[in-house]
Structure formats: structure tokens, C-alpha cells
Amino acid sequence: MLRVRCLRGGSRGAEAAHFIGSRLGRAFTGWVQRSLQSTQAAAASQNRCAAEDKAQSPAPKECPVCSYNEWDPLEEVIVGRAENACVPPFSVEVKANTYEKYWGFYQKFGGESFPKDHVKKAIAEIEEMCNILKKEGVIVKRPDPIDWSVKYRTPDFESTGMYAAMPRDILLVVGNEIIEAPMAWRARFFEYRAYRRIIKDYFNNGAKWTTAPKPTMADELYDQDYPIRSVEDRHKLAAQGKFVTTEFEPCFDAADFIRAGRDIFVQRSQVTNYMGIEWMRRHLAPDYRVHVISFKDPNPMHIDTTFNIIGPGLVLSNPDRPCHQIELFKKAGWTVIHPPVPLIPDDHPLWMSSKWLSMNVLMLDEKRVMVDANETSIQKMFENLGISTIKVNIRHANSLGGGFHCWTCDIRRRGTLQSYFD
């Protein structure tokens, strides 16, 4: 086996560079010296971030990524794009995560664009959302536009893409680290490409960058005979711990995790398996504790329309999907709020989600929340809690599968690492 020894900086590194250069020429000497300088600079930047994280102090400007929870003052965020959004092919994992009334839509339009007029309106809504975030003092970054209609093939499957609309699904920020999730839908296999420019920039400025093991998405990852004929079937299967994804290899969507300082809560869902959860648990230990919680939910996918933590010891808990472990939160002194019934009309298309996007809100800090302009009931709920509402209409953007929390990934919040669940 070929073994390669890294040259470290300092006097020994310089001597090694000189020795190699004398053997292989001046060009190589220059390359080695530049490599040493680059490595030393990157290490120094990385060490600054690591030291700041351990010291539990806010990351300074040198480290652009720093977020420990869902409510500290928001300074920088990635907001997704609806441009070029395509309907995913109607594969078994898509079928398991969507409502039967839309199956014909997927069968007919899989691989093609979502209705263009609808997407155009969604684009305009998200642009307005970005403008409002900027007015509130938040730095906004956007993923690159990509043609998602291009068909691709791996040794295990072929598919077209979907979109880069929901950064919450693919990116998870924990402290000064940004983690790319190994998502479970084949149509999302190459979604990371839209974010690479942004993440490389964060990395070059000192942030940690981790990519979880990429799943092959071979047929073995999915229960090809997953029975989903009715809502009753889904309830039984979820109660039995049976999902369309198997334990063949790790997979998870970042949106199945929600952060509260040292404690991170996750659900086993149609897109997040126990192998994926265990990978995260080992990766984040010992500084963070990963807790598995569950709900009475016939079709679990993404925790933030079921259980959305909006402040220290303050959580929105979906009354239609009660948490089986809710007493643990109450014993820990948390306040559990049941949000009101959503007001979204029955005839509004929701191709990938439920009406409970109303509770999928984005906290700008403990006293400011971005909420849908049409959802007057939940606005009143927040006002009664002493939280001012920033109202934005993203009704057409909702149709693509997300609310404010889904459409964003908070990159930097001004705060420190604390425990809220002791």
C-alpha cells in the first residue's frame, strides 16, 4: 500500500520542502512552499473557528458559519430558488411521501417543469421574501440556478432532478460546521451542486464542511412493495416503525433534525433512517446529544411542520401529530404551544406537503418571526406570545413543498452554545 506523509509547517516543513525541491527542481519547490502556506493559512482559520466553538462564544467575522439553535438573532441565511423546478419522476419513494390525489400529476408530469405560471409566482414571492430579510438586516445568499430537467444515470438508477428550493432539506448547520445531508430521493441526488459555490466560500473563510456518506440509492434502499393504499395503512406502518426507506445504507434529510443548543431532536421518517441518525449521533458526539422523538403521523417527512422549536424552552407542537415523548419536554420546563388550524384553502395545490406549513416559520430572533401573510390565526397566536410578526405571502412557494423554515438555511446566528434540555 502506498503511504503518503503530510508535510507540516514550521522549520521541519521548510527543510522537507527544500530537500524535495533540490531533488525535483525549482518548480516543485515553489508548489510545495505555496501548498505549505495555503495549508498553514487554512489551518489557522480552521483553528480560530474551532477555538471559538469550544469557548462557546459567538464566531467573529473570520468564521462565517455559526448557528446553535433556531432562534438566536439571524445574521446570514441561504434562501432557495424556484427557478427551473421540475416534477420528480414518480418513483416508490416519491409515492410514499405524497398524497394519492396528486399521484396522477406525478405520473403525467414527472421529469417536466412544474406549471410555469405557478413557478413564476413562486419566484416573485421568494424574491420579495429576500428583500424583506435584507431590510431586516439579514445577509441573503442564493444557490446557483441549474437545469434540473437533465436526465442522469448512475450504476444503480436514472432520474431527472428536482430543484434547489429547500436548503433546509440538504444543509444542517451545527456550530461552525455545515453538513451536507445524504438525502433519500433519487431526484435530489445532485442537488448539492447548486450550493457548492457558496459552501466553498464558507470553507475558504474558515468554516468546517462535512459531507455525509453519499447513498448509492440502489433498489435495496427502498421497500419496493411498500403498501400505501390508504391513510389507515400509513398509520399502521408508521406505528410499526416501517417506512419506505430501509436500513441498507445511511440516509437523512437535514430537515428531519431541529436544534436546541447541545440537544438536537430528530425523527425516523420516510427519508431519514436509523443508520443516518446513528451517523449523525457519532459524528456530533460528545459535544451534542441527538434524541430520537416520534409522532402520531401517517407520513413523517421533515420535523419542522410537526415540531418547531421557536425559542429557549418554547416549541410549536402540531395538534394533529402529537409527540409521543411530549411529557419529557414538559418535565424539563418547556412550554408547548399548539398552533391553530391552518387557513390555506382546500383547492390550493400542495404537491409535496400538508397545510401545516403555516407553522413552518422562520425566527429572526426570539421576538421576531417571519410568517405567512394569509395565516391570520397564527399571527394572532404569536402576538399573544409577545412575538412580532413579519408578514410575507409565499402561498405559491408553499406548493413546492415548504414554508419559511424549509425555504431557508440559517448560516449565522449571534449566540453561544448552551443546554436547554437538562
Curated annotation (Swiss-Prot):
It is an enzyme of class 2 (transferase). The active site is at residues 253, 302, 406. The modification Phosphothreonine is found at residue 416. GO terms for molecular function: glycine amidinotransferase activity. The keyword Transit peptide applies. Pathway: Amine and polyamine biosynthesis; creatine biosynthesis; creatine from L-arginine and glycine: step 1/2. GO terms for biological process: creatine biosynthetic process. Residues 1-37 form a transit peptide. Its main location: mitochondrion. Its EC number is 2.1.4.1. Induction: Transiently induced by estrogen, with levels peaking an hour after hormone injection. InterPro entries: AmidinoTrfase. It comes from the Eukaryota. It is found in: Mitochondrion inner membrane. One of its GO terms (cellular component) is mitochondrial inner membrane. Gene3D superfamilies: L-arginine/glycine Amidinotransferase, Chain A. The keyword Membrane applies. It catalyses: L-arginine + glycine = guanidinoacetate + L-ornithine. Keywords: Membrane, Mitochondrion, Mitochondrion inner membrane, Phosphoprotein, Transferase, Transit peptide. Catalyzes the biosynthesis of guanidinoacetate, the immediate precursor of creatine. Creatine plays a vital role in energy metabolism in muscle tissues. May play a role in embryonic and central nervous system development. Homodimer. This is Glycine amidinotransferase, mitochondrial. The gene is GATM.
